Amino acid sequence: MLRTAIRNNVQVSQKRTYIMSTIASTFLGSILFSKNNQLASKMENGELHMPKDPTLSYLNNNNSNNQAEPYFKRREPDYPGHVPLYNYEKFLMFLGSSIGSFFHPEENKYIVALGESTAIEPILKKLQKTMLSDEIGRQILKEKPRITSTSLNLDYLRSLPDNTIGKNYINWLDKEGVSPDTRVQVKYIDNEELSYIFQRYRECHDFYHAITGLPIIIEGEISVKVFEFMNIGIPMTGLGALFAPLRLKSSQRKRLREIYYPWAIKNGIYSKPLINVYWEKILEQDVDEFRKQMGIETPPDLRNMRKEYFARKKLEKQGKL
């Protein structure tokens, strides 16, 4: 009897153990199965180890065709003809135009690109502030005049008295064989008003030549660039003053160093801001009176100095000096 009882107790204990283990296995299995179902669902939905990108969700919700926007997209232009550039594009344009301007200064495309790639926003905003602080400067920014052969009426300028600004300007254009229509439209500078300020500087450049009497030969251009840099502050003009003389002869560098650089630095610093001159409205004014008002002295005649230099060199070769 005792053995039978013991045997029965063992069987009951084994059943209980089996039942408990079965219940535990079933419970754990259901949990694991539920987890597996959740993992499978996440894998199917692409959520496992790859959380949904909120950017992609936004694009999917807002793009009916489920097509993502291109990663690089050029922004909308600020004004007609504007070409927005990334900073690295501006830097590459600066490098290319710098090299091109140094080896081929006669190529206007390099000068144009160098000017716009170096016309950084802080400099243009400073010019903008200069113009906004002056009554005439504000008028220029408001009216945005353009300097062309049509707007100036070159035939009318030829009819003006000899010592007027207009006659002085047209005489210089005719003598140098240039036209106000050759100034390229600005397109790489952001902000419409800042682009106009640079355009205004570009179109007024020939007036600076005319009132100083400096020709468009390399020494004359460098001298005007220094004058502009000291007065207006356009970076390209300063770069031209630094690097352009490296390609000149020693006699040319000597003239610049001893005569034209000192003149340009002094007059550029002490004269009134040229960017605030409304040239179109003072064409009938006496040019000498204008120079006096602005604080500009005329430099020595560069062409005559070159003629005298070459005449002297010729006499030296002939042994007459």
Swiss-Prot record:
Task: List localization entries.
Answer: Mitochondrion inner membrane
- Known PANTHER family for this protein? UBIQUINONE BIOSYNTHESIS PROTEIN (PTHR12922), UBIQUINONE BIOSYNTHESIS PROTEIN COQ4 HOMOLOG, MITOCHONDRIAL (PTHR12922:SF7)
Q: Which cofactor does it need?
A: Zn(2+)
- Which residues of the sequence carry a binding annotation for Zn(2+)? H205, D206, H209, E221
Q: Under which pathway is this protein filed? A: Cofactor biosynthesis; ubiquinone biosynthesis
Repeat found in the keyword field: no
InterPro entries per UniProt: Coq4 (IPR007715), Coq4_euk (IPR027540)
Q: Which superkingdom is the protein from?
A: Eukaryota
- Where is this chain primarily localised? mitochondrion
Keyword Membrane on entry: yes
Q: What is this protein called?
A: Ubiquinone biosynthesis protein COQ4, mitochondrial
Q: How does it sit in the membrane?
A: Peripheral membrane protein
Q: Name one GO biological process term.
A: ubiquinone biosynthetic process
Keywords, A to Z, come to: Lyase, Membrane, Metal-binding, Mitochondrion, Mitochondrion inner membrane, Ubiquinone biosynthesis, Zinc
- Tell me how this protein assembles: Component of a multi-subunit COQ enzyme complex, composed of at least COQ3, COQ4, COQ5, COQ6, COQ7 and COQ9.
| Annotated gene | COQ4
Catalytic reaction list: a 4-hydroxy-3-methoxy-5-(all-trans-polyprenyl)benzoate + H(+) = a 2-methoxy-6-(all-trans-polyprenyl)phenol + CO2
GO cellular component terms? extrinsic component of mitochondrial inner membrane
**Other notes:** This protein may be expected to contain an N-terminal transit peptide but none has been predicted.
| Enzyme Commission number, as recorded | 4.1.1.130
- List the top taxonomic levels of the source: Eukaryota, Fungi, Dikarya, Ascomycota, Saccharomycotina
Q: Which family does it belong to?
A: Belongs to the COQ4 family.
What is its biological role?
Answer: Lyase that catalyzes the C1-decarboxylation of 4-hydroxy-3-methoxy-5-(all-trans-polyprenyl)benzoic acid into 2-methoxy-6-(all-trans-polyprenyl)phenol during ubiquinone biosynthesis.
